Amino acid sequence: MNAWNTIYDQFNPIAFSLGSIEVHWYGLAYACAIVTAFYMALRMIQKDPKRFPIERKEFESYFLWAELGIVLGARVGYILIYEPNSSYYLTHFWQIFNPFDSNGDFVGIRGMSYHGGLVGFLIASYLYSRKDLKKLLIYLDLIAISLPLGYVFGRIGNFLNQELVGRVVPKDSHLGQIIGIMVGNELRYPSQLIEAFLEGVIVFLMVLWAKKHTKTHGLLIVVYGLGYSLMRFIAEFYREPDSQMGVYFLNLSMGQILSLLMVIVSLGILLYATKNSKKIKGNQ
């Protein structure tokens, strides 16, 4: 047993308190994710105006729509897909975003679905662009390259919050014994950090490569969608399935099933892009 294995014993998921309000590391990490994605997008607009011909004020307005769509979609998606008591929220919809418990104590909003957030993001992007659909693919591409590094902070936040834990490490896994984290009395894979690397860093490198080697609007979001789906599918083998869900056919988790659906959506966007997008002129 090494110091890393017992790291959860060394810190508290609560970063600090403001009176009766407890501020969790995840909340801070999510704020870092938003800031990172925002300024990454601004940098891309500045460095490559031919691929991203968007004014800053225009982007700021779109970013607000996109973020709102992500939050709404992520929360509603969790309620519909993962929440065992989803029927309660469907009849008490005001409770979906209620950050207080039955005693009036602030507990924050818990339970977000990445794939639900993706649906919300796509809907918000379409609604914002409906008056000028020529820019829809440009907006999607911009988010595709600015989101992954911000996503890293989100998964680190999950790790610090000691949630979405990994599967139990087999006793014969030498690497697992080294990198595993004690959760309760069991050694588990640090699946949140595995996801941060695969779904954040690796996917970013994929999209960055696509940016350098493609000249058609809409291809970056396709590469992001396909890359994320693949990396999430792999990472799910190290992540403990939600207790209320378990696994389905072929022992696939819900995350893996949704990732396969994400592949279909990405291919649909590819078809749309090939029919409606124009070549990007000039050097990138």
Curated annotation (Swiss-Prot):
Alphabetical list of PROSITE patterns matching this protein: LGT (PS01311)
Pfam families: LGT
EC number(s) stated in the UniProt entry for this protein: 2.5.1.145
Topology of this chain in the membrane: Multi-pass membrane protein
Transmembrane segments: 14-34, 62-82, 106-126, 136-156, 190-210, 218-238, 252-272
Molecular-function GO terms, alphabetical: phosphatidylglycerol-prolipoprotein diacylglyceryl transferase activity
GO BP of this protein: lipoprotein biosynthetic process
Main location: membrane
EC main group: transferase
Protein name: Phosphatidylglycerol--prolipoprotein diacylglyceryl transferase
UniProt organism field: Helicobacter pylori (strain Shi470)
